[in-house]
């Protein structure tokens, strides 16, 4: 029996919606990353994007445990000397709700062209509404 290898054009992709209200950031991110890669499917192939589309709503209501809201630090750099910026989880959620989830998921995906294609299938919204009703996403409970 030959080992099955999925082809990119044969992959069946579903749409799922996750309500992130009062969910822990890391637990949501790990489940989202798993489904974006397609590891929950029997036809998973490491070098092919077999994952599903994930819509996360209420990303502004994500939480972290302990004192990470003030202690967890995110860094970015402008590219200029001395151009390093840092912010904590609480400030990032206030200013850009959902960006912490995007960064967490991106860090769990493969680096390179395959990972870039996978992260494009993640849609994060701070509120309940999203423009993907036409795709009829299925609710996914975590």
From Swiss-Prot:
Q: Which InterPro entries match?
A: Ribosomal_uL13 (IPR005822), Ribosomal_uL13_bac-type (IPR005823), Ribosomal_uL13_sf (IPR036899)
Concerning Pfam families, the annotation shows:
Ribosomal_L13
One GO term describing the cellular component: cytosolic large ribosomal subunit
Give the source's domain of life in one word. Answer: Bacteria
Keywords, in A-Z order: Ribonucleoprotein, Ribosomal protein
Q: Which GO terms describe its molecular function?
A: mRNA binding; structural constituent of ribosome
Please list the GO biological process terms of this entry: negative regulation of translation; translation
Q: Please tell me whether the keyword Signal is annotated for this protein.
A: no
What family, per the record? Belongs to the universal ribosomal protein uL13 family.
What exactly does this protein do? This protein is one of the early assembly proteins of the 50S ribosomal subunit, although it is not seen to bind rRNA by itself. It is important during the early stages of 50S assembly.
Kindly state the subunit structure of this protein. Part of the 50S ribosomal subunit.
PANTHER family listed in its UniProt record: LARGE RIBOSOMAL SUBUNIT PROTEIN UL13M, RIBOSOMAL PROTEIN L13
For this entry, the protein name equals Large ribosomal subunit protein uL13
The UniProt gene name for this protein comes to rplM
């Amino acid at each position: 029996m030959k080992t099955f290898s999925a082809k990119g054009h044969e992959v069946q992709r579903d749409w799922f919606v996750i309500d992130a209200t009062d969910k822990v950031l890391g637990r949501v991110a790990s489940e989202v990353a798993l489904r974006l890669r397609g590891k929950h499917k029997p036809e998973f192939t490491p070098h092919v994007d077999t994952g599903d589309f994930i819509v996360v709503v209420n990303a502004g209501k994500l939480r972290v445990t302990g004192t990470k809201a003030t202690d967890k630090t995110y860094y970015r750099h402008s590219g200029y000397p001395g151009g390093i910026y840092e912010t904590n989880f609480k400030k990032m959620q206030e200013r850009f709700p959902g960006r912490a989830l995007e960064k967490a998921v991106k860090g769990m995906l493969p680096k390179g062209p395959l990972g870039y294609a996978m992260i494009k299938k993640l849609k994060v919204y701070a509120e309940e509404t999203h423009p993907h009703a036409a795709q009829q996403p299925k609710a996914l409970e975590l």
